[in-house]
A protein has these predicted regions:
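N-terminal DNA-binding module of tyrosine recombinases/phage integrases
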Residues: 1-52, 58
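N-terminal core-binding DNA-recognition domain of tyrosine recombinases/integrases
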Residues: 41-55, 64-110
């Protein structure tokens, strides 16, 4: 298979193999998204890892990535060209009106 990685499943839990495999896929997706996001968010990633279910974590990370992409593509709130280049100060300068505009943007495109 081309570039697909094959993992060897060594399931020592009482969970079915398909569940363990799905959890591994979710965690891999989470790690991939985390690498795309700014480094100043690492503390939040650690919080998510220990306090929410993996699927919830994936949903949160996907939403954060979507918001960061919005900041770059649709606003002048950051000079970053890549999500990982967004600065903490860019987030500090976001105002309530900016969030309301984002929410309106989401309503139009969901």
């Amino acid at each position: 298979m081309g570039g697909d990685k094959s993992i060897k499943l060594n399931n020592k839990s009482d969970k079915p193999d398909n569940i363990v495999l799905k959890e591994h896929e979710i965690l891999s997706k989470c790690e991939g998204i985390q690498h795309e996001l700014p480094n100043f968010m690492r503390g939040f990633f650690a919080y998510l890892r220990g306090n929410v279910l993996p699927m919830t974590r994936l949903a949160y990370l996907s939403d954060i990535k979507f918001f960061c992409r919005y900041l770059i593509d649709e606003t002048e709130l950051t000079d970053a060209e890549n999500i990982s280049d967004i600065k903490l100060n860019d987030f500090n300068n976001i105002k309530a009106v900016d969030i309301n505009i984002f929410l309106d943007y989401c309503r139009r495109y969901t």
